[in-house]
Amino acid sequence: MAAGEPGDLGVYSFRFLPQKTFQSLSTPQTTSRLRQWSMLGRIEAQAFGFDQTFQAYRKDDFVTAFFKDPNVIPNLKLLSESSGEWLTLGTEVKKIEAINVPCTQLSMSFFNRLYDEAIVRDNGYIVKCLDSFCDPFLISDELRKVLLVEDSEKYEVFSQPEREEFLFCLFKHLCLGGALCQYEDVINPYLETTKLIYKDLVSVRKNPQTKKIQITSSIFKVTAYDSVGVCYPSTKSHEQTFSYFIVDPIKRHVHVLYHCYGMGEVS
């Protein structure tokens, strides 16, 4: 059914939820780490509410309505490529792309294979390797190699479906960081920060029948276009420039996780 039809399949409308804060991005420890990874001041999470039953198969209608909503346009934040200042959308979105991002992982044991495959030592130190480049990233350890180099020996430690998982994407984004990223020697800061942000953004509930915890969020990686071309998350494409929409169909909230690649705050 198309957007605009009556009942629960009507046009979505949204409201900004400025009172919703994301502690995972603002703790002193996370702030320090994001500064080291050149992401501080360039990563943002925002929350919006919506008023209709969310239907995953109508994701394109949902995202299109989001970008056209009068409560979204003056509040959705993005970074200016030219000035580096935070702006709001300020342009009419003509087209959107919303890619489904699987989200099934409930445990950080997903990353235990990094130890099993000697990418990380038992003491948590990341195994070093000879420097190489996978433009624009410097690869100086086995972790970045397994994240980026498709023909590397251990790339298949994670299957393609596993690499598409939101937990993996979040971990990879933090590991690669911004333009002046200072890489960690040990794995724990990446794992801890990934876990904090993941738990902050993703909704779960206990299944009343099975009593098992299950993820209720639907996640999309979103791009928007105006009459000129890509306008969101940025006019310039980069692997580390992204916007994820994390939709909670029960609370009727959408969390927007945004990052624009560049030089993060240093002080």
From Swiss-Prot:
Name of protein: Cilia- and flagella-associated protein 300
Complex and partners: Interacts with DNAAF2.
Species for this entry: Bos taurus (Bovine)
Described purpose of this protein according to its UniProt entry: Cilium- and flagellum-specific protein that plays a role in axonemal structure organization and motility. May play a role in outer and inner dynein arm assembly.
Keywords: Cell projection, Cytoplasm, Cytoskeleton
UniProt keyword Cytoplasm present: yes
Family designation: Belongs to the CFAP300 family.
Compartment(s) of residence: Cytoplasm; Cytoplasm, Cytoskeleton, Cilium axoneme
GO CC terms of this entry: cytoplasm; cytoskeleton; motile cilium
InterPro entries, per database record: CFAP300
